[in-house]
């Protein structure tokens, strides 16, 4: 095979009814199948080129925009397209044309199918051969397109189509090293298996899977990073010969075979940001064999109330600008309240000291192997904590971990405070009205995440605690604070002062450190 888009020495024949012009054509072993774009319109086409008895070149072209392909055998495919004839400029007759194409080997047959699908879903914007625009695919709307704004998708694919952002993730050695260890420690799950890399990015996870002995890896990537992945994989030929890069969304592409294992890095801030987990679940339903494995297998969102006076004051002070009564002769104070609430609508992304937690954390589990995609549209988590110290509660701290449930080793990737920092950091939702609690007091509430079309979530947080004292025998006075935050617009507080430390009289009841040697870590995170 000369190239992924050219297939020499194929056989083909017409099998259409009623017969189209030239329907009696049958070529055995002497034709060349070429995928490409129309020179004038850029429309994707399959051209079958052969020489006749007089050595004259003949070409049969199939418009892929409305074509379908069906497998007849290991090396045989049926390409069906709709056509119409026109007489005197008037469309007169419509019919379907079916071309049976026979490849030389199963490997070429598989590559032919992949080329058919990739060219069918490709957008040629301008002349053939011009770069494709990020994030655009022709054809009927997929599930991704119906739930995600086109502008958001375009920005998303543009972002991940740049090598500098891929480098940022690759240099997260906690992330990359954990994936590598999870794959290599579970070679038995990969050896001789078919793997699909969902959202392959640079292709690094596909290369890991090939190192672990995968029979074949399909690296599916919708952004322009697919071209970079192809170059990286081609530059590692001993592994790359078992990897096929497919440019497209997992909701739209077709694969020639089912996968034994899916591998992906679909996690965003708070685990669910960017909504790629939904694509991961869709890929499971479309491509994974029954009982197949998923790396990662499950994810957990961890939550605990926190106290951080320094952070609260920092956020509140941001709105002081709007308390000016004479800003070039203008009174800004009418907007102070809105500005104050606006700053508190931003989740804070940073790394914080676990000693700021007011109680042991709880967690909410997402099982990627069984959950439905729709369960990710709205996530409702009840909150119930018991304060370990008496202090002011300034909000809810969140982080996540994921489990690679291999047959040999079960490995966790955690973003917990106190553990090695990742590019995800941790996330905190701040209450504009803090709560006052005493040691042993119950803190209740609700964390409600609602997905939206900008590939993120709106966060609705409610936290409550009872104020004891006069009238406590009747149950006390319930104090409640709420917040509405936008996960897509966080405050990245990556260069911050030392965290606020609780008062000396609070230190005796401090929480155990969230480190592997502590009982709290063992309970929540587990070890190999």
From Swiss-Prot:
The first-level EC class reads transferase
For bias type Low complexity, the affected ranges are 500-520
Q: Which residues form the SAM-dependent MTase PRMT-type domain?
A: 149-464
Instruction: Summarize where S-adenosyl-L-methionine binds, as residue positions.
Output: 166, 175, 199, 221, 251, 279
Q: Which CDD domains match?
A: AdoMet_MTases (cd02440)
- The membrane-spanning stretches of this chain are none
Its annotated compartments are:
Nucleus; Cytoplasm
Looking at the record's lineage, which domain of life comes first? Eukaryota
- Kindly provide the name given to this protein in its UniProt entry: Probable histone-arginine methyltransferase CARM1
- Whose protein is this, by species? Oryza sativa subsp. japonica
């Amino acid at each position: 095979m000369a190239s992924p888009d050219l297939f020499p020495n194929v056989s083909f024949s017409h099998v259409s009814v009623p017969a189209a012009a030239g329907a009696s054509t049958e070529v055995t072993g002497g034709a060349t199948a070429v995928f490409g774009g129309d020179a004038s319109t850029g429309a994707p086409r399959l051209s079958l080129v052969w020489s006749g008895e007089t050595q004259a070149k003949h070409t049969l072209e199939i418009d892929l925009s409305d074509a379908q392909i069906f497998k007849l055998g290991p090396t045989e495919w049926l390409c069906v397209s709709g056509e119409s004839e026109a007489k005197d400029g008037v469309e007169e007759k419509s019919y379907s044309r079916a071309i049976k194409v026979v490849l030389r080997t199963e490997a070429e047959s598989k590559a032919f199918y992949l080329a058919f699908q990739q060219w069918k879903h490709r957008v040629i914007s301008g002349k053939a051969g011009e770069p494709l625009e990020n994030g655009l695919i022709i054809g009927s709307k997929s599930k991704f397109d119906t739930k995600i704004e086109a502008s958001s998708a375009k920005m998303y694919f543009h972002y991940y189509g740049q090598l500098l952002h891929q480098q940022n993730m690759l240099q997260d050695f906690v992330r990359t090293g954990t994936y590598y260890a999870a794959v290599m420690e579970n070679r038995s799950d990969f050896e001789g298996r078919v793997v699909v890399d969902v959202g392959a990015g640079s292709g690094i996870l596909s290369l890991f899977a090939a190192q672990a002995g995968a029979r074949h890896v399909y690296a599916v990537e919708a952004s322009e990073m697919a071209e970079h992945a192809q170059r990286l994989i081609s530059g590692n030929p001993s592994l790359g010969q078992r990897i096929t890069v497919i440019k497209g969304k997992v909701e739209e592409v077709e694969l020639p075979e089912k996968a034994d294992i899916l591998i992906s890095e679909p996690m965003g801030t708070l685990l669910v940001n960017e909504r790629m987990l939904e694509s991961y679940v869709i890929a499971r339903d479309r491509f994974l064999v029954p009982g197949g494995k998923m790396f990662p297998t499950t994810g957990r969102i961890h939550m605990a109330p926190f106290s951080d006076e320094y952070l609260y004051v920092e956020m509140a002070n941001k709105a002081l600008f709007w308390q000016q009564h004479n800003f070039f002769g203008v009174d800004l104070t009418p907007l102070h309240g809105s500005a104050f609430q606006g700053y508190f609508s931003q989740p804070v992304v940073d790394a914080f000291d676990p000693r700021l937690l007011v109680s042991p954390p709880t967690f909410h589990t997402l099982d990627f192997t069984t959950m439905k995609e729709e369960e990710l549209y709205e996530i409702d988590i009840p909150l119930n904590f018991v304060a370990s110290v008496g202090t002011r509660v300034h909000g809810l701290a969140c982080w996540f971990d994921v489990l690679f449930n291999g047959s040999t080793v079960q490995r966790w990737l955690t973003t917990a405070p106190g553990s090695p920092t990742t590019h995800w950091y941790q996330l905190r939702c701040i209450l504009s009205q803090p709560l006052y609690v005493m040691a042993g007091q119950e803190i209740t509430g609700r964390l409600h995440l609602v997905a939206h079309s900008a590939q993120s979530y709106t966060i609705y947080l409610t936290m409550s605690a009872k104020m004891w004292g006069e009238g406590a025998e009747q149950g006390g006075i319930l104090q409640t604070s709420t917040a509405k935050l936008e996960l897509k617009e966080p405050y990245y507080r990556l260069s911050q002062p030392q965290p606020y430390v609780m008062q000396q009289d609070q230190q005796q009841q401090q929480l155990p450190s969230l480190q592997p040697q502590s009982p709290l870590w063992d309970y929540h995170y587990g070890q190999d």
